Amino acid sequence: MSWQQYVDQHLVATQCVTMAAICGLDGSIWAKSNGLELSQDEVATLARSFSKDEVLAANGIRIGGTKYIYLSGDDKLIRGKKDRQGVHIVKTKTAMVMALYAEPILPEQCAVVVEKLGDWLIQNDL
């Protein structure tokens, strides 16, 4: 299965995610939804930001030029929100699974889908 199929079939097709991407920890973009604008700089910055609450709280989370307010996170997760939209990011051994959602999707719905894929990737050393 290609990375694009994971984005399309395991994230967006659930209807719990509006747009998604799977990116390398080096900032490379492996697959993304149509219409999701990402830069390698944004992705690389996010990859370095796990467990850096102070930096994320001060600077927010930037995806596609949009700044999301940092809500919470740890060494594996980053969560953010802007108005009626949000972002949920899971870090694996080699990648980040990034999902955006918008109302009426609830943050918890997006989180379950993204974390399920992230956990599967971790279990398979990806």
From Swiss-Prot:
Occurs in many kinds of cells as a complex with monomeric actin in a 1:1 ratio. Binds to actin and affects the structure of the cytoskeleton. At high concentrations, profilin prevents the polymerization of actin, whereas it enhances it at low concentrations. By binding to PIP2, it inhibits the formation of IP3 and DG. It comes from the Eukaryota. Keywords: Actin-binding, Cytoplasm, Cytoskeleton. InterPro entries: PFN, PFN_euk, PFN_sf, Profilin_CS. GO terms for molecular function: actin monomer binding. It is found in: Cytoplasm, Cytoskeleton. This is Profilin.
